[in-house]
Regions:
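Short, basic/low-complexity N-terminal boundary segments at the transition from targeting/disordered tails
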Residues: 63-78
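Conserved, well-structured beta-alpha core segment at the onset of a catalytic domain
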Residues: 5, 17, 197
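Alpha/beta-hydrolase superfamily serine-hydrolase fold, recognizing
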Residues: 24-65, 85-346
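Bacterial N-terminal signal peptides that target proteins for export
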Residues: 1-9
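Short linear motifs in intrinsically disordered
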Residues: 79-85
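Bacterial N-terminal signal peptides
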Residues: 9-19
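Intrinsically disordered/low-complexity terminal segments and short unstructured peptides
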Residues: 9, 60, 76-78, 89
Length: 346
């Protein structure tokens, strides 16, 4: 039996169990999951991959998490270096607000962006993607959006737990305000990075610090409490996060270190969204966090925030970060850059 059919059969069995406990639960039959023909060949290759066999395995000691972190950083750094070379982007380490960051500069900075600055908060479920690996999304934005970007290499567990990452993002934002008008800057990130960007808005607002002119929120980890339809509908369909039993949620709870995950600084969908900057949100139809993205978009709109949603066919979680040669990747970042251009002052 093909792997995805086996996964679907497992979900069917689980659905039957749930159905016996709750008459409102629906049983979904096992069925093939074809790869769409109207997406790029690069995205087709990503879509066709099975979920990682070890998706539900994670470390159970601080040493184990640190080893996983080092391995991820080494792999991600190779990816970032190769990507920067292909896309003619320079990456320079520096320090802002006492936090290690990377200054990411395209070879073709747009004239309209000479006084603008973007701050990027990296993905990685709060525990992965640090070091030079943190620059991947910044490199893509610099190359396709023609902006200068600061990639924030925030602290992560087991070296530092909640709210250390948030503190670092806010510290860099406050430092950036010394040289730039808030209206000239935007903050963006994917997954945990998007959640941290939102939490930074809450913290800055509470401290009376000006907010940026725009936000970019990619597949945000906006709700760690498990609420959201796509946690069920896209379970075993998303071949990156795979399911709530996968790596990312335990990693986020490791970062939370016993703190209530319903706190808006960890699940920002429960925060006061009124008065936040205009925001563009990105997801895919197979993303486990599609509902988190859609629900956040609706709550932003209901709070009076100018919010735009873009959803890409067949993409699992944040697959636009996986391949810089895919036309969908370019489109994601060109859309975000265009949104920023409309909302940032020059």
């Amino acid at each position: 039996m093909p792997l995805l059919s086996m996964r679907a059969a497992t979900l069917l069995a689980l659905s039957v169990c749930f159905d016996s406990a709750n008459a409102q639960d629906r049983v979904v039959p096992a069925r093939p999951l074809p790869t769409p023909s109207d997406i790029s060949s690069g995205l087709q290759a990503l879509v066709a991959k099975p979920p990682p066999a070890d998706f539900s395995q994670w470390p159970n000691t601080s040493q184990g998490w640190a080893e996983r972190q080092r391995s991820s950083e080494a792999s991600g750094t190779k990816t970032a270096i190769a990507m920067a070379d292909r896309l003619h982007v320079t990456v320079t380490p520096m320090v802002m607000g006492g936090v290690r960051v990377f200054d990411v500069m395209p070879s073709d900075l747009a004239p309209a962006n000479r006084d603008r600055l973007l701050l990027q908060v990296h993905a990685g479920c709060y525990v992965l993607g640090g070091g030079e690996a943190s620059t991947v999304e910044a490199i893509l934005m610099a190359a396709f959006g023609h902006y200068r970007v600061i990639a924030i290499d925030y602290r992560m567990p087991p070296a530092a737990y909640f709210p250390a990452a948030l503190d670092d993002v806010v510290a860099v934002w406050q430092d950036a305000l010394k040289a730039h008008k808030p209206s000239q800057m935007a903050m963006f990130g994917t997954s945990a990075g998007a959640a941290l960007a939102l939490a930074a808005m809450f913290r800055a607002r509470d401290q009376g610090v000006p907010l940026p002119g725009a936000l970019g929120l990619g597949a945000p980890m906006a709700d760690l409490t498990g609420v959201g339809d796509s946690f069920a509908t896209n379970a075993m369909i998303d071949n990156v996060l795979v399911s709530r039993e996968g790596f990312c949620e335990p990693a986020a709870r490791f970062y939370a270190n016993g703190h209530d995950v319903a706190d808006p600084l960890l699940s920002p969908i429960y925060g006061n969204l009124a008065g936040l900057p205009p925001a563009i949100l990105t997801s895919g139809t197979r993303d486990l966090l599609l509902s988190s993205t859609v629900r956040l978009h609706r709550k932003l709109r209901q709070s009076g925030v100018n919010a735009q949603l873009q959803v890409f066919e067949a993409m699992s979680h944040a697959q636009y970060l996986r391949d810089d040669t895919m036309p969908e990747t370019r489109e994601v970042f060109e859309e975000i850059a265009s949104f920023f251009d409309r909302h940032l002052s020059k």
